[in-house]
Amino acid sequence: MANFSAELKKQTKYKAFLLTKRIVEEITQNTYLITFEEDFDFLPGQFCMVSVDGAGLTRKPYTLGRLNKMELAISVKIAGKGSEYIVKTNEKLNVLAPLGNPFIPESNNGAVIVAPSCLAEGIHLSERFDIPLIVASKTELNEKFVKKFKMRVFVGNDEYLNLLSELNHSAFDWIFVSGSRVMEELAVKNMPNKVVYVSLNEYMACGIGACKGCAVETVHGIKHVCTDGPVFRGDNIWQVQRHSD
């Protein structure tokens, strides 16, 4: 099992941070990776809630990442006024973090599959555990950005399905998937004999269990993404028919 004991002991309750954007880089169409001047401690799998008061909206959740094991980062896909504000504002961002439960895998022998909107988290996991990073995107990625990091890129739905069928599942103890619900469900159902973890990206307004907006149905009953997740075993979300060898 990956050793997180020292970091878990250092974990403190979430608090508010004011973050200054260092670089805003377009990864693919309408999707950006933002790095920050400041830093704070968090563990893989955790997320933050970003204030968008300037847009008159509630906070928005984003998974946390770190580039080159140093730079705090998030990935943001512009899907409305709130995310557009986060990308374009010149003001410091008010961020509540770290939130959610950390992802502590049973070994370092895994692989990460993410959509561009979750790429900061994907890079962080890949570098942290020294494991393959695979990006599944509907559109081409910024070539200059791709060259900075070790990743394989698959573009289009057909390419993603081919990836799931051709990936050497037996080489890994686990697969981590973060993207859309459809993307995650396809991974779980196309790899029924593999331990697949999914990082659910659900609407939520608070991130601390108060609003109950992120409730999801699991095989163990209703869970809340912010306090029970955001990372779940995929077969706890979608029932799968396992194949015998």
Model-derived regions, located:
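Ferredoxin-reductase
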Residues: 2-94
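Short Fe-S-cluster ligation motifs
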Residues: 8, 224-245
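Local cysteine-cluster metal-coordination motifs and their immediate loop/turn environment
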Residues: 182, 201-230
